[in-house]
Amino acid sequence: HGKGFGVDALNADNHSWVLSRMAVEFDCQPGQYTDYTIATWINEYGRVLSTRNFTLTDAAGNEFGRAVTQWAMIDLRSRSALDLSWVGDAHADAIVDAPSPTDKPRKIRDVDPAQTAVHKVVYSDIDFNRHVNTMRYIEMMIDMLPLEMLMQEAPVRLDIHFLRECRYGQTLAVGYEQRGLTALFE
């Protein structure tokens, strides 16, 4: 993460990257101890968001997962998003002319939760930006799903939009609604 816009360089100016949206797909669940390779590239900068892509391939070269993530740069003091207009020109050499491996995160419709879990944010939930880590959100959602659904070997897609930060000491309510084969959370 060099080129002047990695986390270390940004933190020196009280800026950081935060995940705004993500879409992750897995064709299958990799077995324990599976060797895999992650490839990543940036293919787009907009005024507010940067798009970073990922693919996961097994040792035989078969792709079994992919992701499109969209990141905002924030001012750590005000916690507000910064204008990224300058990044595209200043760091044009970091942009790879390759398409995203899947669709960008889909719009999430209104959720009518049938079940809600309340969680007080503790130290182990937060990351270096001092807000809840993405994996903790995913764990909270997965923990609400029926075990039978989790044990299925069906392809999985996660679309997540982070609308606001949740920080240490705050209370987070995760709502869950099942619509057919689709699990929706808010």
Where are these regions (language model features)?
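Short coil/loop residues immediately preceding or within conserved phosphate-binding loops
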Residues: R21, T51, T116, Y123, ...
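Hydrophobic, proline/glycine-rich low-complexity stretches
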Residues: H1-D35, L145
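Catalytic strand-loop segment that frames the active site of acyl-thioester-processing enzymes
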Residues: H1, Q70-R79, L84-M151
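A short, polar/charged loop/turn motif at coil->beta-strand junctions and beta-hairpin connectors
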Residues: D13, V18, V111-P113, A154
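HotDog/MaoC-like acyl-thioester-processing domains
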Residues: A23-R109, F162, C166-G169, E177-E186
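Structured core of small recognition/catalytic domains
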Residues: F128-E186
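A broad, structural micro-motif
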Residues: W17-L19, F64, V132
